[in-house]
């Protein structure tokens, strides 16, 4: 393969963000040469985990099986308990159709993913999945089971062991550093990286405002 493909998802980025980003240094370099698709027709439900699974399968949720971020269930002991369910769709084996990175590996290419939803427990390619412990779980044991063999020993001590699990901003920025290391050292033909920072900011502060603008500036730095 003469070229490598890097897919970076800036979660919650909207069309009306583009004029703001166009005035920032790094987006200003690429947007004039970019193919911009406006008024994208979304899947239903428009939630992070179903959307990102559709992106790497090409099929809607009713086919790939990821119908929500969370698995339906009632477990009141879990601090993330809600009517939607306590547990999230963390694990790759819940996807019911082949994915793009799996197909790349089977075609003799090298794939990798960093914080891409629904990739925990993946063994076919390098995966550093988004997953966090509940109050009863040991983070070290959970991550060892969820990450690709070898990835835990490589990244735990330098990154995950320092996470403050109640502060998702830690995961956002460590994730970028891990993705850069994977890109430079592993040289995958396909790299998937999910950047959740803007989505978390909008959940916390609303759709617009100073905090959202500051987050867009941070995305420009990440892009650079």
Locations of regions flagged by a protein language model:
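N-terminal secretory/membrane-targeting segments
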Residues: 1-3, 20, 171-172, 181
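Beta-strand elements within well-structured catalytic alpha/beta cores of enzymes
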Residues: 2-16, 29-31, 55, 104, ...
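Glycine-/proline-rich flexible loop or hinge segments
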Residues: 10-12, 36-38, 48-51, 76-89
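Short, structured active-site-proximal loop/turn typified by the sulfatase FGly-forming signature C/S-X-P-X-R
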Residues: 18-64, 112
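A conditional alpha-helix N-cap/helix-loop micro-motif detector
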Residues: 20, 93-94, 172-173, 216-219
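Charged helix-capping and loop-helix junction motifs
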Residues: 23, 207-213
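Extracytoplasmic/secreted envelope proteins and their assembly/folding machinery
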Residues: 24-27, 176, 220
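His/Asp/Glu-rich, glycine-adjacent segments
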Residues: 59-206
